[in-house]
Structures are given as structure tokens and as C-alpha cells.
From Swiss-Prot:
<dbReference type="InterPro" id="IPR014719">
    <property type="entry name" value="Ribosomal_bL12_C/ClpS-like"/>
</dbReference>
<dbReference type="InterPro" id="IPR013823">
    <property type="entry name" value="Ribosomal_bL12_C"/>
</dbReference>
<dbReference type="Pfam" id="PF00542">
    <property type="entry name" value="Ribosomal_L12"/>
</dbReference>
<comment type="subunit">
    <text>Homodimer. Part of the ribosomal stalk of the 50S ribosomal subunit. Forms a multimeric L10(L12)X complex, where L10 forms an elongated spine to which 2 to 4 L12 dimers bind in a sequential fashion. Binds GTP-bound translation factors.</text>
</comment>
<comment type="similarity">
    <text>Belongs to the bacterial ribosomal protein bL12 family.</text>
</comment>
<dbReference type="GO" id="GO:0022625">
    <property type="term" value="C:cytosolic large ribosomal subunit"/>
</dbReference>
<dbReference type="InterPro" id="IPR036235">
    <property type="entry name" value="Ribosomal_bL12_oligo_N_sf"/>
</dbReference>
<dbReference type="GO" id="GO:0003735">
    <property type="term" value="F:structural constituent of ribosome"/>
</dbReference>
<dbReference type="InterPro" id="IPR000206">
    <property type="entry name" value="Ribosomal_bL12"/>
</dbReference>
<dbReference type="GO" id="GO:0003729">
    <property type="term" value="F:mRNA binding"/>
</dbReference>
<keyword id="KW-0689">Ribosomal protein</keyword>
<keyword id="KW-0687">Ribonucleoprotein</keyword>
<dbReference type="InterPro" id="IPR008932">
    <property type="entry name" value="Ribosomal_bL12_oligo"/>
</dbReference>
<protein>
    <recommendedName>
        <fullName>Large ribosomal subunit protein bL12</fullName>
    </recommendedName>
</protein>
<comment type="function">
    <text>Forms part of the ribosomal stalk which helps the ribosome interact with GTP-bound translation factors. Is thus essential for accurate translation.</text>
</comment>
<dbReference type="GO" id="GO:0006412">
    <property type="term" value="P:translation"/>
</dbReference>
<dbReference type="Pfam" id="PF16320">
    <property type="entry name" value="Ribosomal_L12_N"/>
</dbReference>
């Protein structure tokens, strides 16, 4: 090879924008490649965007209904009567539009006392 890498880099540094554009086109034609950014690769994952808001749903109270009612009151701030109605009428949404971390925390608290919980 007549030119070493340092000489090629020095030549590229000295070239004008038009000359560099011609160089890119010549390389694309010679090697059958394109200098375009691979945008299609990022879009190929497409589909649904990652979900950021979740709904915590009480599927059933399980065996320890009283403990579940206490935790539901703590989580939702409902009164005793409202929390009992919510638990009795399961499946019901407890909290909507919460972050993933908060939803997982709520689920863990409820499952700890025997409830069946779904995060959607």
C-alpha cells in the first residue's frame, strides 16, 4: 500500500466538505455500502412502547380477608366500610396509573398477607 493510515487521515483533514462528500459517494459505490445511519434497526423493535403506568388489581382476598382489608386501607386511604366493599367485590382495581416500582411494592404488601394481586 502506497499510503499509510496517517497520510490518509492527513489528506481527509485537509479536504473540503465537497471533496469529502465525493469521497463518501465513491466509497459507497466501490464497496456497495451506504453511509446512512441504521435507523431501521432501532425501529425494528417497534411494537408497543414500554408501559410506564400500571394498574394494581386485587384478584381475590385469599384466606386472610381482615389482613387484606387493613392493607387495602393503608394503600388506598379508604375507610373501613369502603375497603371492605372493595375486597368483597374483587376483582377490583386498587390503584391506577402508578409507576412500576410502586405497583410492585403494593403487590408485595398484599401478597404478603395472602391476597392474589395482578399488575396490569
Amino acid at each position: 500500500m502506497a499510503l499509510n493510515i496517517e497520510e490518509i487521515i492527513a489528506s481527509v483533514k485537509e479536504a473540503s466538505v465537497l471533496e469529502l462528500n465525493d469521497l463518501v459517494k465513491a466509497i459507497e459505490e466501490e464497496f456497495g455500502v451506504t453511509a446512512a445511519a441504521p435507523v431501521a434497526v432501532a425501529a425494528a423493535g417497534g411494537g408497543a412502547a414500554e408501559q410506564t403506568e400500571f394498574t394494581v388489581e386485587l384478584a381475590s382476598a385469599g384466606d386472610s380477608k381482615i389482613k387484606v382489608i387493613k392493607v387495602v386501607r393503608e394503600i388506598t386511604g379508604l375507610g373501613l366500610k369502603e375497603a371492605k366493599e372493595l375486597v368483597d367485590n374483587a376483582p377490583k382495581a386498587l390503584k391506577e396509573g402508578v409507576a412500576k416500582d410502586e405497583a410492585e411494592e403494593i403487590k408485595a404488601k398484599l401478597e404478603e398477607v395472602g391476597a392474589n394481586v395482578e399488575v396490569k
